[in-house]
Amino acid sequence: NYWDAPFLYPYKNVTALSDNLFGTLPIYAVFRSGGADRETAFQLWLLSLFALNFICCFIALNSWSKNVVLSSVGAYVFAFSIYNLGQLDHVQVFPKFIAPLVLFWFWKFLSERKIKYFLFTSLGLIYQFYCGMYLAFMLSYILLFFGIAYFAIYRDRSWLNEFKNKKQLIYFASIIGLSVVLLLPLLKP
């Protein structure tokens, strides 16, 4: 079975000891289903991650700045920097394409207070957990400090009014509940 991978035999449940990359499994599966052997599918998977990192970062930066040149440069650094190329032996650090979008959605949520951006942020963070546990924890810390910095800089106390609205509270609670349910399969392999 998947959780009892043979590389630490006879130890059980070894896949749960590290990043399992479930979130990127569909990408790999497309190449395997298309007839690629496992090494070729792995190479195509890796190239796809580089492309997705660039594309998603470009979308997030361009949505923020509306400047194609700056967005392209930022996305290039995010996807192809020397740090990334130096990590080719550690492929678990590459499925981070959702992170720039999550940061963008979180900013939109803080600045516009639309519940849909909280939903997108939550689902994106959960997806990052499925793509890579360690990257997701780092993204969680970034979101935490991003939120703290936002409130420290803007000193926006009108946010408290959002929590007086019962309908908003129900939406927040529902999204948090959904997030917990979606994370449960990773917690109980």
Task: List PLM regions with ranges.
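Short loop/turn hinge sites at secondary-structure boundaries
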Residues: 1, 112-113, 155-158
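Short, intrinsically disordered, charge-balanced linker/junction segments flanking boundaries
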Residues: 1, 184-189
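Membrane-interface coil-to-helix junctions
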Residues: 1-53, 76-96
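Intrinsic low-complexity, intrinsically disordered segments enriched in polar/basic residues
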Residues: 2, 8, 129, 164-167
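Juxtamembrane loop-helix boundary motifs flanking transmembrane segments in multi-pass membrane proteins
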Residues: 22, 36, 115-119, 158-161
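Membrane-embedded helix bundles of polyisoprenyl
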Residues: 45-64, 69-153, 172-179, 185-186
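Membrane-interfacial, low-structure loops and terminal tails that flank and connect transmembrane helices
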Residues: 153-168
